[in-house]
Amino acid sequence: MKPNRLLPLVLLLTALSAHAKDFIIYDRMDYVGKPDLTADKLSKVFLVYESELVKPDPTGKRKHGVLNEARIRELAKQSRREGYRTISTDIESWFAEKDGQLLTPDELRTDFARMYQIFREENPRAFISNYGMPSEHLHGIRHYRPNVDNEAILAKWRQVSKRRAPTAAISDYANPVFYITSPDLVQWEKDVKTAVDDIHQRFPNKKIIGYIWPQYYSATSSPYFKQFIDPVRWRKMLEISKKYTDGVIIWSDKRDENNQIVRWNDPRIQATMKATQAFIHANAKEIKVEGLQKY
């Protein structure tokens, strides 16, 4: 019997296929004049900020406020009406102390469970999580502790993240923050890997969709504050994100490092998009697009 010279190639292709995974890129950039980017293989995510989800406690007892259930139900109906599946809520203040009050992990879990329930009641397709689940922004914590050794930084990160675990457990996916604070991609990748490894250990069945930003993190003490990331480095960030996660939400506000409004035709964001499109083209078979499914 003659040896099958194609067999090694077939086995190699099979192995490569087995390691390939879908990767999804959600667009939540807020640059003025941005068009619909679905044709460029960017998907849509329904992002809702805290100001629409939380209202002052009528009794005045709870300093962090309470769920605005009527508004949440309206938003949930809107998400279904407009065809969204993936939803990211952005409640951040509940995880910090406010006027001497600190919500317990059980209180957090109960309120998030209620909010998630409302979304799922009104939008059965809802795939929902909250910004920063299940852990704090490790790379940001490192930025604010430049002279602290790595083990102490990791210990602080684990400590401040611990209260999020019960809420993360009931979230549909992990939604960590991977904003970069400086051009140091080596350290950024290490921090991404550390956060992802932690998620895999604690929540092995959850998809990981991280937040990234075409600008450097808005740390006021940073010399790179909100400057645009160069396109070569941005492309590498996408490649690293694909290596470790299931997808990213590309987020931005409207302003640059000089507090100037950024328009879509700005050469800086166009360079970012060119790098993003090149990344998508190079990984076309693995880029998943989640379109709107209107009722």
Where are these regions (language model features)?
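Boundary/entry segment of secreted carbohydrate-active catalytic domains
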Residues: 20-62
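Aromatic- and acid-rich polysaccharide-binding/catalytic face
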Residues: 91, 156-189, 253
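Hydrophobic h-region of N-terminal signal peptides that target proteins for export
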Residues: 11-19
